[in-house]
Regions:
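C-terminal target-recognition/interaction regions appended to catalytic cores
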Residues: 1-139
């Protein structure tokens, strides 16, 4: 808990006092992982949500103010799932690992919507152009 409490918004394990440093981060190789044990910052862009976003030590998934990692619902909201979206059938037991995998592996719904609308718009314009060309040719 002390490590989490010493992580500042936008910061990571680099902000910890020496006595809280993990041995792996004292080694040269371990110093390259700058986002692990990271705390999000309200003013920054959210991190990429991975399948392990519910773990504080797996990336910049620390809540900006509270001493904890993101919840499943918070990760889903960052991914643009509707707030009332259900990831399992009613009555089924919640398995955090399974749901975090669904959320982390998902194409964000809003991104999918934008791409779909773009494809539809392109198709509609293309269809209109083909129809116009056909009319000009007398067909």
């Amino acid at each position: 808990m002390q490590r989490i409490q010493h992580s500042i918004p936008g910061g990571s394990w680099h902000d910890w006092p020496e006595n809280l440093m993990l041995e792996c981060h004292k080694k040269e190789k371990g110093q390259t992982y700058t986002s692990v044990y990271g705390r999000m910052c309200w003013e920054d862009v959210a991190p990429t949500i991975t399948t392990q976003f519910t773990g504080y030590g797996t990336g910049r998934f620390g809540h900006p103010e509270q001493d904890r990692a993101l919840t499943l619902r918070e990760g889903a909201i960052i991914q643009t799932f509707p707030e009332n979206y259900s990831f399992l059938p009613e009555g089924e037991a919640v398995v955090i690992k399974d749901i975090s995998r669904q959320i982390g592996n998902a194409v964000p719904p809003r991104l999918g919507e934008i791409i779909g609308l773009s494809i539809k718009e392109h198709y509609t314009k293309r269809k209109y152009v083909r129809k116009s060309e056909s009319i000009k040719k007398g067909g």
